[in-house]
């Protein structure tokens, strides 16, 4: 959006200031106020001449910040924000704190077209993709809400990032160069869109110089048949083709791929499933991240027992697969993996 300043680099803001008839240092001042001070309107940038601020607002230039609609905090301090865009759409983003880090789980679209059966986001379909400033804002909003500098960012909120790759990669550039978050601390999660992984690698090298962020591919099943049952769009992307594209991505970037696997009680969590998964990803420079299912209202999937989770993990480890188990955070506020939607909690009811 040409009149929005958030999301622009220091160099872009310097050039823009010169084009407006001012010195380039004014662009650097704006950059500081956008990313370090987190202003929400041009009128707040007191370092700029008042007359110029008035002129810019008259020309409809704006910062591009979103509006905080609702904030909820879980018992474990995980914080979920409902944010409104200028056109009235809403998205959710989550801040996940530990003693050592603050991870922000951000959305790349309003809703999601992938319709994974175990995920709340896809139940309402896709409204539109988010612009760069709308994605960047989520990190700033969490920073403000939690009064803490984010250390890690994961594109695991609402939407399919590879259906909005231009804005996602520009956001990564902004997070890296403007907010100082290292690429290796950024993860892009995808359920898989045919032919996009090699394109992502090439576009990342063009825009970022190197693709150093982590790619996380959501498998959630050890074979094509079961994957299609859980992920309707998987019918267009055969399992072997997806893994071949992951290998191609690895060859292009030199970066290990992470595979995500949601464990659904007595559906995809048998030891036989673990053995089949190990056969698929074994000998591959990769890592498997296990995620216990987080309940949503519309589905009757079960969260697996801790015994079944541990048995699944042991099978992978015995077969030489690097594996970890993601802790579920924010469950009591519907802020955990797979639970995000465009709503907030009022008492015990979704509104």
UniProtKB/Swiss-Prot annotation:
It comes from the Bacteria. SUPFAM superfamilies: Radical SAM enzymes. The active site is at 92 (proton acceptor), 337 (s-methylcysteine intermediate). Pfam families: Radical_SAM (PF04055), RlmN_N (PF21016). One of its GO terms (biological process) is tRNA methylation. S-adenosyl-L-methionine binds at residues 159-160, 189, 218-220, 294. Disulfide bonds join 105-337. InterPro entries: Aldolase_TIM, Methyltransferase_A, RlmN_N, RNA_MTrfase_RlmN, rRNA_lsu_MTrfase_RlmN/Cfr, rSAM. Binds 1 [4Fe-4S] cluster. The cluster is coordinated with 3 cysteines and an exchangeable S-adenosyl-L-methionine. Its main location: cytoplasm. Keywords: 4Fe-4S, Cytoplasm, Disulfide bond, Iron, Iron-sulfur, Metal-binding, Methyltransferase, rRNA processing, S-adenosyl-L-methionine, Transferase, tRNA processing. It is an enzyme of class 2 (transferase). Specifically methylates position 2 of adenine 2503 in 23S rRNA and position 2 of adenine 37 in tRNAs. Belongs to the radical SAM superfamily. RlmN family. This is Probable dual-specificity RNA methyltransferase RlmN. It comes from Synechococcus sp. (strain CC9902).
